[in-house]
Swiss-Prot record:
Keywords: ATP synthesis, CF(0), Hydrogen ion transport, Ion transport, Membrane, Thylakoid, Transmembrane, Transmembrane helix, Transport. The lineage of its organism: Bacteria, Bacillati, Cyanobacteriota, Cyanophyceae, Oscillatoriophycideae. The gene is atpF. It holds the Pfam family ATP-synt_B. InterPro entries: ATP_synth_B-like_membr_sf, ATP_synth_b/b'su_bac/chlpt, ATP_synth_F0_bsu_bac. HAMAP family: ATP_synth_b_bprime (MF_01398). This is ATP synthase subunit b. It is found in: Cellular thylakoid membrane. It comes from the Bacteria. F-type ATPases have 2 components, F(1) - the catalytic core - and F(0) - the membrane proton channel. F(1) has five subunits: alpha(3), beta(3), gamma(1), delta(1), epsilon(1). F(0) has four main subunits: a(1), b(1), b'(1) and c(10-14). The alpha and beta chains form an alternating ring which encloses part of the gamma chain. F(1) is attached to F(0) by a central stalk formed by the gamma and epsilon chains, while a peripheral stalk is formed by the delta, b and b' chains. GO terms for molecular function: proton-transporting ATP synthase activity, rotational mechanism.
Length: 180
């Protein structure tokens, strides 16, 4: 049906062309003429629209570039600031580590000195305890010797020693014990 309509229009156009107005069915002749008119209209009216569209696009691209540049500058500033903070933090960490090492050395030295003092004190205490024990043993031995000597003297006295001999024996025993 559409084809019939087109054919009908084409035949009427041919008849009308003979009269002066109608559709020209010569494809090569009409297409070049129509294309040149269409191209002229597009250039004349399209230039303004296309220029406006391209101008808007150019301004949007320029704004996007400016915004990107601004964000880049802000990011660079923030990066520099954070790098400074990082450097300061590293310096502070080094100070803390150095202080900790110094403190550890000082504490180690203090502990070693205190341990040495404790060892010295223990040695002195042990020496005093040993000396006191020796003194106690010596006193106990002297007391036993004295008791044995007195017992020996008493037994000899009871057997009948003379009084002058007894006195000499007592004096000698006391002198041996450190009495006189």
């Amino acid at each position: 049906m559409i084809i019939d309509t087109i054919l009908l229009l084409a035949t009427e156009a041919k008849e009308a062309a003979a009269e002066g107005f109608g559709i020209n069915t010569d494809i090569l002749g009409t297409n070049l003429f129509n294309l040149s008119i269409l191209l002229g209209l597009i250039i004349f009216y399209g230039r303004k629209v296309l220029g406006q569209i391209l101008g808007e696009r150019q301004s949007k691209i320029a704004e996007a570039l400016a915004e990107a540049e601004n964000r880049k500058n802000i990011a660079a500033t923030a990066l520099a600031e954070e790098q400074k903070k990082l450097a300061l933090a590293k310096q502070e960490a080094e100070k803390i580590i150095d202080n900790s090492r110094s403190r550890a050395k000082a504490v180690t030295a203090d502990i070693a000195a205190q341990a040495e003092l404790d060892i010295q004190r223990m040695r002195e205490s042990a020496a005093k305890d040993l000396s006191a024990e020796q003194d106690r043993v010596l006193v106990e031995l002297r007391q036993r010797i004295t008791a044995l000597a007195l017992a020996n003297v008493e037994s000899q006295l009871s057997t009948g020693l003379e009084e002058s001999v007894q006195q000499t024996l007592i004096d000698r025993s006391l002198a041996n014990l450190g009495g006189k």
